[in-house]
Protein backbone atom coordinates (compact mmCIF):
# COMPACT_ATOMS: atom_id res chain seq x y z
CA UNK A 1 0.00 0.00 0.00
CA UNK A 2 2.78 2.43 0.92
CA UNK A 3 4.44 1.83 -2.45
CA UNK A 4 1.34 3.17 -4.22
CA UNK A 5 1.40 6.29 -2.05
CA UNK A 6 5.13 6.75 -2.62
CA UNK A 7 4.67 6.69 -6.40
CA UNK A 8 2.46 9.76 -6.05
CA UNK A 9 4.46 11.59 -3.37
CA UNK A 10 7.95 11.09 -4.80
CA UNK A 11 7.33 13.79 -7.40
CA UNK A 12 6.99 16.26 -4.51
CA UNK A 13 9.23 14.62 -1.92
CA UNK A 14 12.22 12.74 -3.42
CA UNK A 15 12.70 10.89 -0.12
CA UNK A 16 9.74 8.65 -0.99
CA UNK A 17 11.77 7.05 -3.79
CA UNK A 18 13.37 4.95 -1.06
CA UNK A 19 10.18 2.88 -0.90
CA UNK A 20 10.80 1.64 -4.43
CA UNK A 21 13.88 -0.23 -3.20
CA UNK A 22 13.12 -3.81 -2.27
CA UNK A 23 15.90 -3.96 0.32
CA UNK A 24 14.54 -0.89 2.12
CA UNK A 25 11.01 -2.27 2.24
CA UNK A 26 12.32 -5.65 3.44
CA UNK A 27 14.11 -4.00 6.37
CA UNK A 28 11.00 -2.00 7.22
CA UNK A 29 8.98 -5.20 6.95
CA UNK A 30 11.11 -6.95 9.58
CA UNK A 31 10.96 -3.95 11.92
CA UNK A 32 7.21 -3.49 11.48
CA UNK A 33 6.29 -7.15 12.02
CA UNK A 34 8.61 -7.39 15.02
CA UNK A 35 7.17 -4.22 16.56
CA UNK A 36 3.57 -5.34 16.08
CA UNK A 37 4.32 -8.72 17.67
CA UNK A 38 6.07 -7.17 20.67
CA UNK A 39 3.27 -4.64 21.14
CA UNK A 40 0.47 -7.16 20.69
CA UNK A 41 2.00 -10.02 22.70
CA UNK A 42 1.26 -8.94 26.30
CA UNK A 43 -2.26 -7.83 25.39
CA UNK A 44 -3.05 -11.08 23.59
CA UNK A 45 -1.62 -13.20 26.41
CA UNK A 46 -3.73 -11.38 29.03
CA UNK A 47 -6.81 -11.74 26.84
CA UNK A 48 -6.23 -15.47 26.36
CA UNK A 49 -5.66 -15.91 30.10
CA UNK A 50 -8.89 -14.08 30.92
CA UNK A 51 -10.78 -16.36 28.55
CA UNK A 52 -8.95 -19.38 30.03
CA UNK A 53 -7.79 -20.45 26.59
CA UNK A 54 -4.97 -22.72 27.72
CA UNK A 55 -2.91 -25.52 26.25
CA UNK A 56 -4.31 -29.04 26.41
CA UNK A 57 -1.58 -31.55 27.39
CA UNK A 58 -1.86 -35.27 26.73
CA UNK A 59 -1.83 -37.51 29.82
CA UNK A 60 0.51 -39.96 28.05
CA UNK A 61 3.05 -37.26 27.16
CA UNK A 62 6.35 -36.47 28.90
CA UNK A 63 5.89 -35.57 32.57
CA UNK A 64 7.80 -32.33 32.05
CA UNK A 65 4.90 -31.12 29.91
CA UNK A 66 2.28 -31.35 32.65
CA UNK A 67 3.39 -27.95 33.94
CA UNK A 68 2.45 -26.47 30.56
CA UNK A 69 -1.26 -27.12 31.14
CA UNK A 70 -3.17 -23.87 31.04
CA UNK A 71 -0.43 -21.90 29.24
CA UNK A 72 -2.23 -19.61 26.77
CA UNK A 73 -2.39 -20.96 23.24
CA UNK A 74 -3.61 -19.60 19.88
CA UNK A 75 -0.71 -17.12 19.97
CA UNK A 76 -0.48 -17.60 16.22
CA UNK A 77 -3.09 -14.85 16.03
CA UNK A 78 -0.26 -12.47 16.94
CA UNK A 79 1.96 -13.84 14.17
CA UNK A 80 -0.72 -13.69 11.48
CA UNK A 81 -1.78 -10.18 12.46
CA UNK A 82 1.81 -8.91 12.33
CA UNK A 83 2.48 -10.54 8.95
CA UNK A 84 -0.80 -9.39 7.40
CA UNK A 85 -0.51 -5.76 8.49
CA UNK A 86 3.14 -5.63 7.46
CA UNK A 87 2.58 -7.15 4.02
CA UNK A 88 -0.32 -4.82 3.29
CA UNK A 89 1.84 -1.86 4.30
CA UNK A 90 5.09 -2.62 2.51
CA UNK A 91 4.44 -5.13 -0.29
CA UNK A 92 3.38 -4.35 -3.85
CA UNK A 93 -0.26 -5.46 -3.74
CA UNK A 94 -0.48 -5.66 -7.53
CA UNK A 95 1.79 -8.72 -7.38
CA UNK A 96 -0.26 -11.96 -7.62
CA UNK A 97 2.43 -13.96 -5.79
CA UNK A 98 1.91 -11.86 -2.67
CA UNK A 99 -1.82 -12.61 -2.76
CA UNK A 100 -1.19 -16.34 -3.26
CA UNK A 101 0.90 -16.56 -0.09
CA UNK A 102 -1.54 -14.44 1.91
CA UNK A 103 -4.50 -16.53 0.74
CA UNK A 104 -2.85 -19.70 2.02
CA UNK A 105 -1.57 -18.04 5.21
CA UNK A 106 -4.98 -16.71 6.22
CA UNK A 107 -6.92 -19.70 4.89
CA UNK A 108 -4.83 -22.19 6.83
CA UNK A 109 -4.88 -19.83 9.78
CA UNK A 110 -8.69 -20.00 9.74
CA UNK A 111 -8.59 -23.82 9.67
CA UNK A 112 -6.13 -23.81 12.58
CA UNK A 113 -8.26 -21.31 14.50
CA UNK A 114 -11.32 -23.57 14.30
CA UNK A 115 -9.20 -26.55 15.35
CA UNK A 116 -7.78 -24.67 18.35
CA UNK A 117 -11.19 -23.28 19.28
CA UNK A 118 -12.72 -26.74 19.45
CA UNK A 119 -9.79 -28.00 21.56
CA UNK A 120 -9.45 -25.25 24.13
CA UNK A 121 -12.89 -23.63 24.23
CA UNK A 122 -15.19 -26.55 23.47
CA UNK A 123 -12.82 -28.85 25.44
CA UNK A 124 -12.77 -31.34 22.56
CA UNK A 125 -9.24 -32.79 22.69
CA UNK A 126 -9.51 -34.04 19.09
CA UNK A 127 -10.20 -30.54 17.77
CA UNK A 128 -11.50 -30.26 14.22
CA UNK A 129 -12.40 -33.67 12.81
CA UNK A 130 -9.38 -34.89 10.82
CA UNK A 131 -11.25 -35.40 7.56
CA UNK A 132 -12.64 -31.88 7.67
CA UNK A 133 -9.26 -30.39 8.49
CA UNK A 134 -7.73 -32.27 5.56
CA UNK A 135 -10.64 -31.28 3.31
CA UNK A 136 -10.18 -27.57 3.92
CA UNK A 137 -6.40 -27.78 3.67
CA UNK A 138 -6.80 -29.58 0.35
CA UNK A 139 -9.41 -27.16 -0.96
CA UNK A 140 -7.25 -24.12 -0.23
CA UNK A 141 -4.13 -25.73 -1.70
CA UNK A 142 -5.94 -26.82 -4.87
CA UNK A 143 -7.43 -23.36 -5.44
CA UNK A 144 -3.93 -21.88 -5.30
CA UNK A 145 -2.43 -24.69 -7.39
CA UNK A 146 -4.95 -24.29 -10.22
CA UNK A 147 -4.69 -20.48 -10.13
CA UNK A 148 -0.89 -20.51 -10.27
CA UNK A 149 -0.87 -23.06 -13.07
CA UNK A 150 -3.29 -20.98 -15.13
CA UNK A 151 -1.21 -17.85 -14.47
CA UNK A 152 2.23 -19.31 -15.25
CA UNK A 153 1.44 -22.16 -17.67
CA UNK A 154 4.35 -23.13 -19.96
CA UNK A 155 6.70 -20.52 -18.47
CA UNK A 156 9.62 -20.69 -16.05
CA UNK A 157 7.05 -20.52 -13.25
CA UNK A 158 5.93 -24.11 -13.93
CA UNK A 159 9.33 -25.71 -14.49
CA UNK A 160 10.85 -28.26 -12.13
CA UNK A 161 14.24 -27.18 -10.78
CA UNK A 162 16.49 -30.12 -9.93
CA UNK A 163 19.41 -29.38 -7.56
CA UNK A 164 22.95 -29.82 -8.93
CA UNK A 165 21.76 -29.94 -12.58
CA UNK A 166 21.65 -26.59 -14.35
CA UNK A 167 20.22 -27.90 -17.63
CA UNK A 168 17.44 -30.10 -16.25
CA UNK A 169 14.33 -27.93 -15.93
CA UNK A 170 11.40 -29.84 -17.46
CA UNK A 171 7.95 -28.35 -17.83
CA UNK A 172 5.66 -30.04 -15.34
CA UNK A 173 2.38 -29.56 -17.13
CA UNK A 174 -0.60 -30.63 -15.03
CA UNK A 175 1.81 -32.40 -12.66
CA UNK A 176 2.55 -28.90 -11.35
CA UNK A 177 -0.88 -28.83 -9.70
CA UNK A 178 -0.27 -32.14 -7.93
CA UNK A 179 3.21 -31.11 -6.77
CA UNK A 180 1.95 -27.75 -5.51
CA UNK A 181 -0.84 -29.45 -3.59
CA UNK A 182 1.46 -31.91 -1.82
CA UNK A 183 4.10 -29.28 -1.00
CA UNK A 184 1.62 -26.85 0.57
CA UNK A 185 -0.38 -29.43 2.53
CA UNK A 186 2.70 -31.43 3.49
CA UNK A 187 4.68 -28.45 4.74
CA UNK A 188 1.72 -27.16 6.72
CA UNK A 189 1.30 -30.44 8.58
CA UNK A 190 5.07 -30.87 9.04
CA UNK A 191 5.40 -27.53 10.84
CA UNK A 192 2.34 -28.42 12.89
CA UNK A 193 3.96 -31.68 14.04
CA UNK A 194 7.17 -29.85 14.95
CA UNK A 195 5.37 -27.37 17.19
CA UNK A 196 5.67 -29.43 20.37
CA UNK A 197 8.30 -27.63 22.46
CA UNK A 198 8.83 -24.00 23.46
CA UNK A 199 10.21 -22.16 20.45
CA UNK A 200 10.99 -25.37 18.55
CA UNK A 201 8.93 -24.63 15.43
CA UNK A 202 9.25 -20.86 15.18
CA UNK A 203 13.03 -20.57 14.81
CA UNK A 204 13.34 -23.12 11.96
CA UNK A 205 10.44 -21.25 10.34
CA UNK A 206 12.38 -17.99 10.67
CA UNK A 207 15.55 -19.59 9.25
CA UNK A 208 13.70 -21.08 6.28
CA UNK A 209 11.88 -17.80 5.59
CA UNK A 210 15.20 -15.94 5.67
CA UNK A 211 16.66 -18.45 3.22
CA UNK A 212 13.71 -18.04 0.90
CA UNK A 213 14.05 -14.26 1.09
CA UNK A 214 17.47 -14.58 -0.54
CA UNK A 215 16.21 -17.12 -3.07
CA UNK A 216 13.22 -14.93 -3.96
CA UNK A 217 15.52 -11.97 -4.55
CA UNK A 218 17.85 -14.06 -6.73
CA UNK A 219 14.95 -15.55 -8.69
CA UNK A 220 13.51 -12.12 -9.39
CA UNK A 221 16.86 -10.67 -10.48
CA UNK A 222 17.59 -11.66 -14.07
CA UNK A 223 21.37 -11.34 -13.78
CA UNK A 224 21.62 -13.31 -10.55
CA UNK A 225 19.15 -15.94 -11.76
CA UNK A 226 21.23 -16.50 -14.88
CA UNK A 227 24.41 -16.64 -12.80
CA UNK A 228 22.95 -19.34 -10.54
CA UNK A 229 21.21 -21.14 -13.43
CA UNK A 230 17.79 -20.93 -11.82
CA UNK A 231 14.54 -19.78 -13.49
CA UNK A 232 14.05 -16.04 -13.69
CA UNK A 233 10.59 -15.19 -12.36
CA UNK A 234 10.18 -11.39 -12.06
CA UNK A 235 7.18 -11.59 -9.72
CA UNK A 236 9.14 -13.65 -7.18
CA UNK A 237 11.24 -10.72 -5.95
CA UNK A 238 8.30 -9.20 -4.06
CA UNK A 239 8.20 -12.31 -1.89
CA UNK A 240 11.28 -10.89 -0.14
CA UNK A 241 8.93 -8.52 1.70
CA UNK A 242 6.63 -11.40 2.68
CA UNK A 243 9.55 -13.51 3.92
CA UNK A 244 10.88 -10.54 5.87
CA UNK A 245 7.48 -10.13 7.53
CA UNK A 246 7.56 -13.80 8.58
CA UNK A 247 11.06 -13.31 10.02
CA UNK A 248 10.06 -10.21 11.99
CA UNK A 249 6.81 -11.71 13.28
CA UNK A 250 8.65 -14.92 14.17
CA UNK A 251 11.25 -13.13 16.27
CA UNK A 252 8.51 -11.12 17.96
CA UNK A 253 6.59 -14.27 18.81
CA UNK A 254 9.75 -15.99 20.07
CA UNK A 255 10.09 -13.20 22.66
CA UNK A 256 7.06 -14.73 24.40
CA UNK A 257 7.42 -18.34 23.24
CA UNK A 258 11.00 -18.96 24.37
CA UNK A 259 11.46 -21.46 27.22
CA UNK A 260 9.53 -21.36 29.50
CA UNK A 261 6.83 -20.25 27.09
CA UNK A 262 4.28 -17.59 28.02
CA UNK A 263 2.17 -18.52 24.99
CA UNK A 264 1.99 -21.21 22.31
CA UNK A 265 1.19 -20.53 18.67
CA UNK A 266 -1.39 -23.31 18.34
CA UNK A 267 -2.61 -24.71 15.04
CA UNK A 268 -3.70 -21.23 13.98
CA UNK A 269 0.00 -20.37 13.74
CA UNK A 270 1.71 -23.62 12.78
CA UNK A 271 -0.67 -24.64 9.97
CA UNK A 272 -0.59 -21.12 8.53
CA UNK A 273 3.20 -20.69 8.65
CA UNK A 274 3.80 -24.13 7.16
CA UNK A 275 1.35 -23.46 4.36
CA UNK A 276 3.00 -20.11 3.63
CA UNK A 277 6.48 -21.65 3.45
CA UNK A 278 5.22 -24.36 1.11
CA UNK A 279 3.59 -21.78 -1.14
CA UNK A 280 6.74 -19.66 -1.27
CA UNK A 281 8.81 -22.73 -2.17
CA UNK A 282 6.47 -23.45 -5.07
CA UNK A 283 6.48 -19.85 -6.29
CA UNK A 284 10.28 -19.64 -6.42
CA UNK A 285 10.47 -23.18 -7.89
CA UNK A 286 12.62 -24.59 -5.09
CA UNK A 287 10.59 -27.47 -3.70
CA UNK A 288 13.69 -29.64 -3.39
CA UNK A 289 15.52 -26.96 -1.43
CA UNK A 290 12.55 -26.75 0.93
CA UNK A 291 13.18 -30.40 1.82
CA UNK A 292 16.77 -29.52 2.73
CA UNK A 293 16.12 -26.19 4.47
CA UNK A 294 13.13 -27.60 6.31
CA UNK A 295 14.98 -30.79 7.22
CA UNK A 296 13.88 -30.51 10.85
CA UNK A 297 10.25 -30.49 9.73
CA UNK A 298 10.90 -33.45 7.42
CA UNK A 299 12.56 -35.55 10.14
CA UNK A 300 9.79 -34.76 12.63
CA UNK A 301 7.19 -35.91 10.10
CA UNK A 302 9.10 -39.03 9.10
CA UNK A 303 9.49 -40.00 12.75
CA UNK A 304 5.70 -40.04 13.12
CA UNK A 305 5.19 -42.00 9.89
CA UNK A 306 7.84 -44.57 10.85
CA UNK A 307 6.51 -44.87 14.40
CA UNK A 308 2.93 -45.48 13.28
CA UNK A 309 3.98 -47.79 10.44
CA UNK A 310 6.28 -49.87 12.63
CA UNK A 311 3.65 -50.25 15.34
CA UNK A 312 0.96 -51.34 12.90
CA UNK A 313 3.20 -53.75 10.96
CA UNK A 314 5.40 -55.17 13.72
CA UNK A 315 3.67 -54.19 16.93
CA UNK A 316 6.86 -52.40 18.00
CA UNK A 317 7.79 -48.74 18.32
CA UNK A 318 11.02 -47.35 16.88
CA UNK A 319 11.13 -44.29 19.14
CA UNK A 320 10.17 -43.88 22.77
CA UNK A 321 7.66 -41.34 21.55
CA UNK A 322 6.96 -39.47 18.31
CA UNK A 323 7.48 -36.83 16.99
CA UNK A 324 11.18 -37.32 17.57
CA UNK A 325 11.68 -34.31 19.86
CA UNK A 326 9.69 -36.20 22.51
CA UNK A 327 12.00 -39.20 22.03
CA UNK A 328 14.97 -37.11 23.12
CA UNK A 329 13.02 -35.69 26.06
CA UNK A 330 12.26 -39.20 27.29
CA UNK A 331 15.95 -40.07 26.90
CA UNK A 332 16.65 -37.45 29.54
CA UNK A 333 17.59 -34.42 27.45
CA UNK A 334 16.42 -31.16 29.05
CA UNK A 335 13.88 -29.38 26.87
CA UNK A 336 16.12 -26.34 26.16
CA UNK A 337 18.88 -28.67 24.92
CA UNK A 338 16.54 -30.36 22.44
CA UNK A 339 15.26 -27.00 21.23
CA UNK A 340 18.61 -25.28 20.73
CA UNK A 341 20.19 -28.30 19.04
CA UNK A 342 17.29 -28.50 16.60
CA UNK A 343 17.74 -24.77 15.95
CA UNK A 344 21.43 -25.26 15.18
CA UNK A 345 20.67 -28.13 12.82
CA UNK A 346 18.01 -26.04 11.10
CA UNK A 347 20.38 -23.11 10.57
CA UNK A 348 23.05 -25.41 9.11
CA UNK A 349 20.54 -27.02 6.75
CA UNK A 350 19.47 -23.62 5.43
CA UNK A 351 23.11 -22.69 4.77
CA UNK A 352 23.72 -26.03 3.04
CA UNK A 353 20.64 -25.52 0.86
CA UNK A 354 21.78 -22.04 -0.17
CA UNK A 355 25.24 -23.41 -0.98
CA UNK A 356 23.72 -25.96 -3.37
CA UNK A 357 22.50 -23.10 -5.56
CA UNK A 358 26.07 -22.62 -6.75
CA UNK A 359 26.85 -26.34 -7.08
CA UNK A 360 25.55 -27.00 -10.58
From Swiss-Prot:
Reactions catalysed according to its record: UDP-N-acetyl-alpha-D-muramoyl-L-alanyl-gamma-D-glutamyl-meso-2,6-diaminopimeloyl-D-alanyl-D-alanine + di-trans,octa-cis-undecaprenyl phosphate = di-trans,octa-cis-undecaprenyl diphospho-N-acetyl-alpha-D-muramoyl-L-alanyl-D-glutamyl-meso-2,6-diaminopimeloyl-D-alanyl-D-alanine + UMP
Main subcellular location of this protein, as a coarse class: membrane
GO CC terms: plasma membrane
Enzyme class: transferase
GO biological process entries: cell division; cell wall organization; peptidoglycan biosynthetic process; regulation of cell shape
Keyword Ribosomal protein recorded: no
Molecular function GO terms recorded: metal ion binding; phospho-N-acetylmuramoyl-pentapeptide-transferase activity; UDP-N-acetylmuramoyl-L-alanyl-D-glutamyl-meso-2,6-diaminopimelyl-D-alanyl-D-alanine:undecaprenyl-phosphate transferase activity
Annotated pathway: Cell wall biogenesis; peptidoglycan biosynthesis
Superkingdom, natural source: Bacteria
Pfam families reported for this sequence: Glycos_transf_4, MraY_sig1
Localisation: Cell inner membrane
Topology in membrane: Multi-pass membrane protein
TM stretches of this protein: 21-41, 73-93, 94-114, 132-152, 168-188, 199-219, 236-256, 263-283, 288-308, 338-358
Coiled-coil zones: none
Cofactor names: Mg(2+)
Its EC number(s): 2.7.8.13
UniProt keyword annotations, A-Z: Cell cycle, Cell division, Cell inner membrane, Cell membrane, Cell shape, Cell wall biogenesis/degradation, Magnesium, Membrane, Metal-binding, Peptidoglycan synthesis, Transferase, Transmembrane, Transmembrane helix
HAMAP family documented for this protein: MraY
Membership in a protein family: Belongs to the glycosyltransferase 4 family. MraY subfamily.
Primary role: Catalyzes the initial step of the lipid cycle reactions in the biosynthesis of the cell wall peptidoglycan: transfers peptidoglycan precursor phospho-MurNAc-pentapeptide from UDP-MurNAc-pentapeptide onto the lipid carrier undecaprenyl phosphate, yielding undecaprenyl-pyrophosphoryl-MurNAc-pentapeptide, known as lipid I.
Protein name: Phospho-N-acetylmuramoyl-pentapeptide-transferase
Organism lineage string: Bacteria, Pseudomonadati, Pseudomonadota, Gammaproteobacteria, Vibrionales
Gene for this chain: mraY
